[in-house]
Regions:
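Helix-loop element at the rim of GNAT/NAT acetyltransferase active sites that forms part
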Residues: 12, 31-48
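Conserved acetyl-CoA-binding loop-helix of GNAT-fold acetyltransferases
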Residues: 103-105, 111-126, 148-152
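A short beta-loop-alpha structural element at the N-terminal edge
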Residues: 16-31
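Acetyl-CoA-dependent GNAT
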Residues: 11, 37, 49-108, 119, ...
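Conserved acetyl-CoA-binding loop of GNAT-fold acetyltransferases
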Residues: 151-161
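C-terminal "cap" of GNAT-fold acetyltransferases
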Residues: 133, 140-147, 160-182
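Short acidic N-proximal helix/loop "leader" segments that mark the beginning
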Residues: 1-12
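Conserved GNAT acetyl-CoA-binding A-motif
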Residues: 119, 126-138
């Protein structure tokens, strides 16, 4: 186990559990991911992302759990998956020092402190990993709340990447690249 399960309190007083994701969570995580993919104005996805199967999700979780520089954390409320954060460390020898972060949560749990909790736990874990030196992420320029969250956690804007998605899919298809030196 890379991270011990721990209970946290959201700004609303609701208790959530943050723990590592397991292969057995594949179906529940996939269901939650589909919900926030379909309801978010900011996630940049392709139609193939919605074609992911439970078996695909299980393989992905297994690979993350096998990689010592990767981590998948789930946030649960009343036993239900409400969000996740994953840090994918590269398996390539020349890229071992970097990790890519991805996070998502159900709309009703946004702006309640869940993103801050998940980000804090994954950054603390990454700082304990001797091979990781920098964390990277990509966020829609229109997602001002997420950008504020990442900046508050110490991430710096490194650049932009235009035209990642059709304009009708997101408010602004330009993506911001951010990094955090550990």
């Amino acid at each position: 186990m890379k991270v011990e399960a721990q209970e946290y309190e959201l700004k609303t007083g609701e208790k959530i559990l943050v723990r590592e994701g397991k292969v057995a969570d594949s179906g529940a995580l996939l269901k939650t991911e589909r919900e926030y993919i379909l309801t978010s104005r900011y996630l940049i996805v392709s139609p193939s992302d919605l074609e992911q199967t439970v078996a695909d999700e299980a393989r992905w979780i297994k690979e993350l759990n096998k990689n010592p520089s990767s981590l998948l954390l789930l946030a649960l409320h009343n036993g239900n998956v409400i969000g996740h954060i994953d840090l994918t460390g590269s398996g390539e020898e020349y890229e071992e020092q970097s990790g890519l972060i991805s996070m998502g949560m159900l709309q009703e749990y946004q702006n309640k402190g869940l993103g801050s909790i998940l980000l804090r736990v994954v950054v603390e874990w990454a700082r304990q990993q001797h091979q990781l030196q920098v964390l990277c992420l990509q966020v829609s320029r229109a997602n001002k709340g997420a950008i504020r969250l990442y900046k508050k956690a110490g991430f710096k804007t490194e650049g932009k990447q235009p035209d990642l998605a059709p304009e009708e899919q997101v408010d602004d298809s330009e993506s911001v690249i951010m990094t955090l030196n550990l």
